[in-house]
UniProtKB/Swiss-Prot annotation:
Its main location: plastid. Belongs to the intron maturase 2 family. MatK subfamily. Usually encoded in the trnK tRNA gene intron. Probably assists in splicing its own and other chloroplast group II introns. GO terms for molecular function: RNA binding. It comes from the Eukaryota. GO terms for biological process: mRNA processing; tRNA processing. The keyword tRNA processing applies. It is found in: Plastid, Chloroplast. Transmembrane segments: none annotated. This is Maturase K. Keywords: Chloroplast, mRNA processing, Plastid, RNA-binding, tRNA processing. It comes from Micranthes punctata. Pfam families: MatK_N. The keyword Chloroplast applies.
Length: 353
């Protein structure tokens, strides 16, 4: 447990970063405007006036600077709206989402530069990344027996989504603005597809840059907790009585570990070094494979369902996670059908006289 405490230490250098003032700088929205313009050119969709876009941005920044536009009361829901109903409504929505995405990317870039300066990435040269998909399929796939096909759930509660992002963005003002932005878009049925109980589906053809950041932050949070627990439990395989009691004690502490991760875990555990169980992800789909019997994957299947429900308030059914034997079924992954072919060997015996 002492080694695992190192993952729970907060990264102090990012706690004093204030990103909220950047949201009122014109050059941020100039970058966002160029991104939108390039995307519109590629899609041959120029539905707004380019000449008036800079004026719209300046007016938008001015309105964002006024606190009255960030207050919406129940009695006056149609007045003082932050996002007004006009012909430029869609463009303003895109500008705000793209601007926020640019600001959050700055935070990610600072974290990456800091890691490179401290040479923290060198520590992982002897471990297998969970995103090393092709080495996994080439080297490890042939030695596996059972595989669990998992579709990552993507319908999140708004507050859970904001709380997940706060591990990366320490500026409370920016997160409050994001919360207001998501709730306003949900009420107007513009940016997101609303689901019951104030949840959103992180799937949108528009504003892809912002939703890509939100989706990745959620997946990183999910993987950092789930893989860490898988990694810790896999070291308890001995059949001795001492290790058996250690295993029982560990599973009794799983709930505590999840709570600690959910409140204090600042970074993502990118590496998975378990030799008997393998995890790999591609976009919204992941697989969990094992060399042993299907009982182990069955256990983790039900745990994964409870994990999503308890930590992210995601309703998921165990029937959506399929466990297949590779010798009898093919795995549809990365557009390929992969399977393991058995090589039966003939055994010949001879009676001795």
């Amino acid at each position: 447990m002492e080694e695992s405490q190192g993952y729970l230490e907060l990264n102090k250098f990012l706690q004093n970063d204030f990103l909220y003032p950047l949201l009122f700088q014109e050059y941020i929205y100039a970058v966002a405007h160029d991104h939108i313009l390039n995307r519109c050119i590629l899609s041959d969709n120029l539905s707004y006036d380019n000449k008036s876009s800079s004026l719209i941005v300046k007016r938008l920044i001015t309105r964002m600077s006024q606190p009255n536009h960030l207050i919406i009361s129940d009695n006056d829901s149609n007045q003082n709206q932050f996002l007004x109903h006009n012909k430029n409504f869609d463009y303003q929505n895109q500008m705000i989402s793209e601007g926020f995405a640019v600001v959050v990317e700055i935070q990610f870039s600072l974290r990456l530069v800091f890691s490179l300066e401290r040479k923290e990435i060198v520590k992982s040269h002897n471990l297998r990344s969970i995103h090393s998909i092709f080495p996994f399929l080439e080297d490890n796939f042939l030695h596996l027996n059972y595989v669990s096909d998992i579709l990552i759930x993507h319908s999140l509660h708004l507050e859970i989504l904001v709380q997940t992002l706060r591990y990366w963005v320490k500026d409370a003002s920016s997160l409050h603005l994001l919360r207001f932005f998501l709730y306003e878009y949900q009420n107007r049925n513009s940016l997101i597809t609303p689901t019951p109980k104030k949840s959103i589906s992180i799937v949108s053809k528009r504003n892809q840059r912002l939703f890509l950041i939100l989706y990745n932050s959620y997946v990183c949070e999910y993987e950092s907790i789930f893989i860490f627990i898988c990694n810790q439990s896999s070291h308890l395989r001995s059949i001795s009585s001492g290790t058996l009691f250690e295993r029982i004690y560990f599973y009794g502490k799983i709930k505590h570990l999840v709570e600690v991760f959910y409140t204090d875990f600042p970074t993502v555990l990118w590496l998975f070094k378990v030799p008997f169980m393998h995890y790999v992800r591609y976009q919204g789909k992941s697989i969990l494979a094992s060399k042993g019997a299907p009982l182990l994957l069955n256990k983790w299947k039900y745990y994964l369902v409870n994990f999503w429900q308890c930590n992210f308030y995601l309703w998921s059914q165990s029937g959506r996670i399929h466990i297949n034997q590779l010798s009898k079924n093919s795995l549809n992954f990365l557009g390929y059908l992969s399977s393991v072919r058995l090589n039966p060997s003939a055994v010949r015996s001879q009676m001795l006289e």
